Amino acid sequence: PWINPENQEESFNMLNTAQADICMAHLDLNGFYMHENIRQTHGYDKSIVSRFEKTITGHFHTKNDDGQIFYLGAQYEMTWSDYGQQKYFHIFDTETRELEAIPNPFTIFAKLVYNDDETNYDEFDISPYHNKFVKLVVVNKKNNEMFDRLLERLYHKITVHELKILE
């Protein structure tokens, strides 16, 4: 269940009486990471699923667990908060009760750190930024013409969904 004020009583009753060893739900439990550095503190106590051998749940974007409760995390990047975190698809074997995590190789966010003291951007491979939301973080820009040529390439040689320049 997704527990909310309209179904809270019914959901708790279901969690307490279900004839099951495994719970699969969309839960908001305290102590787990919602995002990489943000731990939930205003949800439900995890004891509401303590009677289950294993609880597999969603809702939080970051994959994390305590050995009994498994947050699968988002399967793909949705926001910049997901950037840099490996995302997974999962297979649950109902006979062995093993949960297999399969890495998702695809991402939609990318950062490009610009430092023209270290890199010649006229020769820089921009293909990894194709079909991405890109943050261009400018650390050192002494060659304005090369910077402009890089921007021109990003806008016209590949497709970027969005380009944010942080100077």
Region spans (language model):
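His/Asp/Glu-rich metal-coordinating catalytic cores
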Residues: 1-70
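Short beta->alpha connector loops
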Residues: 2-7, 75, 117-119, 141-143
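Short flexible/disordered coil segments
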Residues: 2-5, 87-90, 163
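Surface-exposed beta-strand edges and their flanking turn/coil or helix-capping segments
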Residues: 10-14, 36-38, 83-86, 112-117, ...
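Short, low-complexity, polar/charged sequence segments that are solvent-exposed and flexible
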Residues: 16-19, 41-45, 74-75, 88-91, ...
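Short gly/pro-enriched beta-turn/loop segments at secondary-structure junctions
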Residues: 18, 50, 84-87, 94, ...
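Active-site-adjacent helix-turn-beta-strand microarchitecture at beta-sheet edges
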Residues: 54-57, 65-121
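Accessory, non-catalytic peripheral segments of nucleic-acid enzymes
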Residues: 94-167
